[in-house]
């Protein structure tokens, strides 16, 4: 092989490697990641870890855990008792210290349905709106179980936050639990590590996932992302989709904001044309976001939620 041919071959390898590294998707297959790699722990900094697990229909639910001298803090669980039990077992491979704090980043079941596996003496940090939602969910679950099966257990934290910020000293590492406003739900909480400059955003940040708006506040949500982007953060961690390297994490959060604004604007445009929700779903042009994960499931829900906002059904 000539020297020129060798350089061409090397260049092609580099280009192909860069192309593979640049795949940005919530789909593990598109990233070339086998499902057998999950669940997996992603080290974010000393004593700070992300936890990625696969849920149906084949994308990640992300949790955060932080290890201090006095114990472990977890932000968001997984979507079933079995999945949360596995998460706790994986955490014990990193630290045998007790899990003492749990932050309800999202009150949705795909993050809370396994909370019955948490230690009984754990301290919950939850927004009042999310606690109220969990009370409602608990009542509903107790009366709507399947015939012959025990009702689903919804854990309701005993008390809620009394302000929009709570600082927790884990021993050698400090976290701030923040409410930046209504976004994916009415009570989204984020976990900020000021020394490490990491912000776990829970479901307020869905990396390459079509904006899921079942309980969302569309206009408020974009403002929350703006507040997060204005913070002293080098790495943003999503509640779904993949954990990215620092620079990419910011780029992808900005991309998600673009998606959120575009989806909301398209739903408003269709509403302005006088289209029914059903006709709007058929007529919608989502542009590049039509190919984002869950677009086929979440597009109609987004239209319904924006229509609810415009027609005064969301307060």
Which residues are covered by each model-predicted region?
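Active-site neighborhood of phospho(di)ester-bond hydrolases with catalytic His/Asp-centered motifs
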Residues: 75-77, 100-108, 125-129, 180, ...
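Boundary at the C-terminal end of the N-terminal hydrophobic targeting segment
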Residues: 19-21
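Bacterial N-terminal signal peptides
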Residues: 5-17
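Conserved beta-strand hairpin/beta-sheet module of binuclear metal-dependent hydrolase folds
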Residues: 42-90, 189-203
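Divalent-metal (often Zn2+) His-rich catalytic cores of metallo-beta-lactamase-fold enzymes
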Residues: 222-275, 279
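C-terminal regulatory/interaction regions
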Residues: 272-315
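Core dinuclear metal-dependent hydrolase active-site scaffold
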Residues: 43, 164-193
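Active-site HxH/HxHxD metal-binding segment of metal-dependent hydrolases
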Residues: 89-167
């Amino acid at each position: 092989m000539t020297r020129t041919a060798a350089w061409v071959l090397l260049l092609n390898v580099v280009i192909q490697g860069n192309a593979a590294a640049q795949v940005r998707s919530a789909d593990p297959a598109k990233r070339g990641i086998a499902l057998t790699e999950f669940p997996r722990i992603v080290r974010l900094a000393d004593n700070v870890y992300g936890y990625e697990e696969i849920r149906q229909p084949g994308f990640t639910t992300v949790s955060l855990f932080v290890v201090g001298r006095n114990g472990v803090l977890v932000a968001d669980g997984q979507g079933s008792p079995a999945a949360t039990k596995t998460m706790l077992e994986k955490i014990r491979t990193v630290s045998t210290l007790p899990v003492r704090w749990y932050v309800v980043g999202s009150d949705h079941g795909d993050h809370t349905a396994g909370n019955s596996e948490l230690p009984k003496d754990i301290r919950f940090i939850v927004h009042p709106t999310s606690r109220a939602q969990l009370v409602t969910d608990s009542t509903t679950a107790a009366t709507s179980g399947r015939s012959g099966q025990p009702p689903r257990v919804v854990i309701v934290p005993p008390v809620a936050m009394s302000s929009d910020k709570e600082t927790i000293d884990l021993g050698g590492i400090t976290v701030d639990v923040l409410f930046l406003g209504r976004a994916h739900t009415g009570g989204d909480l984020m976990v900020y590590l000021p020394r490490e400059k990491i912000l776990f955003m829970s479901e307020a940040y869905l990396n390459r996932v079509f904006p899921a708006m079942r309980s969302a506040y569309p206009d408020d949500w974009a403002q929350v992302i703006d507040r997060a982007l204005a913070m002293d953060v080098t790495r943003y961690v999503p509640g779904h989709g993949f954990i990215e390297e620092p620079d990419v994490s910011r780029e992808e959060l900005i991309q998600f904001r673009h998606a959120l604004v575009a989806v909301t604007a398209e739903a408003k445009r269709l509403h302005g044309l006088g289209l029914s929700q059903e006709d709007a779903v058929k007529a919608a042009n989502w542009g590049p976001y039509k190919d984002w994960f869950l677009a086929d499931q979440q597009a109609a829900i987004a239209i319904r939620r924006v229509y609810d906002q415009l027609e005064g059904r969301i307060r």
